[in-house]
Swiss-Prot record:
UniProt function note: Produces ATP from ADP in the presence of a proton gradient across the membrane.
Membrane topology: Peripheral membrane protein
InterPro entries for the chain: ATP_synth_F1_dsu/esu, ATP_synth_F1_dsu/esu_N, ATPsynth_dsu/esu_N
Keyword Methyltransferase part of the UniProt annotation: no
GO molecular-function terms, A-Z: ATP binding; proton-transporting ATP synthase activity, rotational mechanism
Name this protein carries in UniProt: ATP synthase epsilon chain
């Protein structure tokens, strides 16, 4: 499978950058899977979504993303999130607490963080 260049960037920092074989993200139009050679597209990311990047070594980089855009060009894929966290950085206990006591937007973010960290609730 051919590789493509992928950037995962949030307003506050670059979370991940490198070669990948696939990217899956949730947009306002539905879930989209991107492979090398995909047609150019610009999609709006959903609030409280999860992005999964598959590396050439078959490792999966997972992140909780909150708003932003996904851009696919001939040069690669850019995920530009308003905010994002890598799955291995998520405090699962805190996210569960946020689900219990948060308002609707805080709950959506917390649920996204739990999904990215591999916990359904």
């Amino acid at each position: 499978m051919a590789n493509m260049s992928v950037q995962l960037v949030a307003v506050e920092r670059r979370l991940w950058s490198g070669e990948a074989t696939a990217v899956v993200a949730q947009t306002t139009e539905g879930e989209i899977g991107i492979l090398s050679g995909h047609e150019p597209v610009l999609g709006q990311l959903v609030e409280g979504g999860v992005v999964k990047i598959t590396t050439p070594e078959k490792e999966t980089v997972t992140a909780a993303v909150h708003g932003g855009f996904l851009s696919v060009t001939a040069d690669g894929v850019s995920v530009l999130a308003e905010s994002a966290e890598l799955a291995d950085e998520i405090d699962v206990a805190q996210a569960r607490e946020d689900v219990k006591r948060g308002d609707e937007q805080a709950r959506a973010r917390a649920l996204s963080r739990l999904r990215a960290a591999g916990h359904s609730s």
